[in-house]
């Protein structure tokens, strides 16, 4: 079974020889400095160079045992294309917004529409084409910003969160525009050859906005996005929500995404209870991956697998300073699991 076959079957809820081990990309980036050194492609240059981007993610797949290719390596491509100013970071830090595109939600007409033929959006689609040709057996995951996280990259988050209660129509209008642009970026990535969509909305945590606002301002937009990719392209989706999702209750069951990924603070048994019927993904601590040792990571990985996780993955991506040997410990545990089960 190839890596692509295993992941696509797992996302479809079909039987696989063992759970796949993936790290989608985007905010859950799979890139570490040891891989950069090995393939001689580095941040921040790779964020703006399609060939370097492709070579770096392919190197991560081949050197760490992560069973996918994932790009971009950040959550700023859509925001930059819509008018935000972005710094590309450094060798050990991801791109980040340095200036919002809007001073208030009333400035929505200042925003530009993403042009997927230009800038870093074009870099990403070109990188997907390169990867499709070089590694057709490895699944390519296209990463998009969720509507709330994109909105809070375009305007001060405090203004946005305030609007959820005292300016709802303005918040919905910004959500709709954010979703429209994320969909355009996703369409371009899928048309270039991406196999799976991952939508991360870390700014939409239950702790920040509560269940009622999640049901009104997050759930409908995430579901519209995942239905779009399923119906238009036949592609499955993963949705990642940060924070402790207990406050959301079973609202996760209403997500139409095939798979749900959550923070390490949420155990696999709880995730399976809150997102019944969904393919579960997680839940190795990002901090443990960076600061732990291979033996501890092997034990934690085995625990996740024994608890029934469907897709083994870092909870919130991988720190660039994470040792390759720590990632390999997780990969090797996943590969052995079929003989342990």
Where in this protein do the model-derived segments appear?
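Active-site nucleophile and cofactor-binding loops and adjacent substrate-binding regions
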Residues: 47-48, 73, 242
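A contiguous, low-structure linker/loop signature
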Residues: 71-114, 137
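Active-site loop segments of alpha/beta catalytic cores
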Residues: 3-31, 36-39, 67, 89-97, ...
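Generic hydrophobic, aliphatic-rich segments that mediate packing or membrane embedding
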Residues: 53, 57, 78, 104-107, ...
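N-terminal low-complexity or amphipathic/hydrophobic leaders
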Residues: 56-77
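Active-site-flanking structural segment that lines cofactor/substrate pockets
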Residues: 28, 33-63
